[in-house]
């Protein structure tokens, strides 16, 4: 049983059982980034144009260790998609990685595709799926009524809404449509939750394991995967929200780094020329010592990162203050992210579509 011991007074130890609390994240990379190695999990990293691509494979043994379904997870991490040039670079990598995951699942150029936009179109941080579909090329009706130029495949789109507005399980709607139109494979797009502030709106995850809509915010619905639909399901998502636990725990870690950096560079003449609010200490190499942590936070400062997160979770959750938070510019970012995903899918699915057209 996982226990965190918090010193209370001089001679009293208070034990808090935190095993029953689960930190919210949909990203596989969140669960492995702070661990040196986990049995049953293989990962490789590469960087192109300052964009990080992490390829993770989880087998059955690794699946039990981190409670993630076995399969392939590709994560693309970037800094800024509001700039056109950067957005085009991210889109190019997204297309290449999506083509790779389609190839790994033996999906051919002739296989038809149902693209599903999961989420609530009336909630800005949750509208990634429906908004991405606005950019997707639909061709099935063109195949029905006439010849289509070579280089395009049959594509359909579906926006099933959310159970709160339809009263129907999202997975059941998708399953019914799949049984009727019989696509070769499904691409499901959804907004995700992250365990890191740094990854919010700056990460795209692709996986061939399918998806549990709403799982990142504690509203888990029926699984949408090969197991339930009997065809390949590629899930694509971007973390658009974090919970209060993540914000508080990340702030504590940044506080440690800020203190250590300033302590070690107090006499550095360069820092005297830079306003304190403009100094990005995260770009510096910082060695945060246990002594630094204890000076700032006492006994809590000696806890591991995961222990701090779970302790904060226990403090906030019972009183209903573990809120889900999104950046104030989310509507602007959603426009850019949906462009990358929607038009990126067009490029990956249709040989005739490229960056120019």
Pin down the residues of each PLM region.
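Glycine-rich phosphate/diphosphate-binding loop of Rossmann-like nucleotide-binding domains
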Residues: 120-153, 157
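Helix-enriched interaction subdomains in cytosolic or periplasmic regions
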Residues: 65-93
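A structural signal for small-residue-enriched, beta-sheet-centric alpha/beta enzyme cores
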Residues: 158-159, 188-356
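N-terminal amphipathic/basic leader segments beginning at the initiator methionine
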Residues: 6-70
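Short glycine-rich or small-residue beta-strand-to-loop segments that form or flank ligand, phosphate
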Residues: 75-79, 112-123, 157-161
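Conserved acidic residues
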Residues: 113, 184-185, 233
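Gly/Ser/Thr-rich loops at beta-strand to alpha-helix junctions
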Residues: 118-126, 164, 191-195
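A structural-propensity feature for long, helix-poor, extended segments
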Residues: 150-178
